[in-house]
Amino acid sequence: MIPLAIKIGITGPVGSIKSEALQKIIDMLKNDNLNVQGVLVSKVTNNGKLTGYTIEDIESKRKAQFCFDNFVSRVKIDKLGVDTKILEEILIPSLQKARETADVIVIDEIGKLENTTKKVHAEIEETLKCGKPLIVTLHKRSRNPVLQEIKSLEGVRVFDITPINKNILPFKVMHVLKGEE
């Protein structure tokens, strides 16, 4: 059983090591028969060029591209247009259900998502304040105030992932989640 209110932040450079570590943590939690819910964000590339992002509901596996290089929108992530309707259709019900039924909630790339729409911002804020164990990832150099907000939450631990510690970090996070550290 994981103590309530434990919040884990994983920061690191742009690249896949945060996602790889997060997926390993999710797999370890599921192997412990814990209900993990929330959202994962993945890059979409074409010939090595970033062309968008997808969002996936961890529990239902519902996945859609919400960010495109050729999509006209006032809302941007990394200069890519955001289809806020698609983002809200997956993120909002996923986080609402996670707050009700998950043992552990995950929000991947929280800094990118936080300021896309007022509804998304409100859902993320509500989820950050809920008493459930939470794991979030964000870019290390994010100037987004969400990093400071996460650091100020009660029971939070922030881990900086590097190529050197990427293999042991999931085990360290699991020890913290289980109250062993």
Curated annotation (Swiss-Prot):
Q: Which Pfam families match?
A: NTPase_1
Q: Which UniProt keywords apply?
A: ATP-binding, Hydrolase, Nucleotide-binding
In terms of InterPro entries, this protein maps to: Nuc-triphosphatase_THEP1 (IPR004948), P-loop_NTPase (IPR027417)
As one GO molecular function, the record gives:
ATP binding
* Chain ranges passing through the membrane: none
Instruction: Report residues binding ATP.
Output: 12-19, 104-111
Record's catalysed reaction(s): a ribonucleoside 5'-triphosphate + H2O = a ribonucleoside 5'-diphosphate + phosphate + H(+)
Which residues are in coiled coils? Answer: none
Q: Give the enzyme class.
A: hydrolase
Return the EC number. 3.6.1.15
Show the NCBIfam families listed in the entry: PRK13695.1
Q: What does this protein do?
A: Has nucleotide phosphatase activity towards ATP, GTP, CTP, TTP and UTP. May hydrolyze nucleoside diphosphates with lower efficiency.
For this chain, the family text in UniProt reads:
Belongs to the THEP1 NTPase family.
Q: What is this protein called?
A: Nucleoside-triphosphatase THEP1
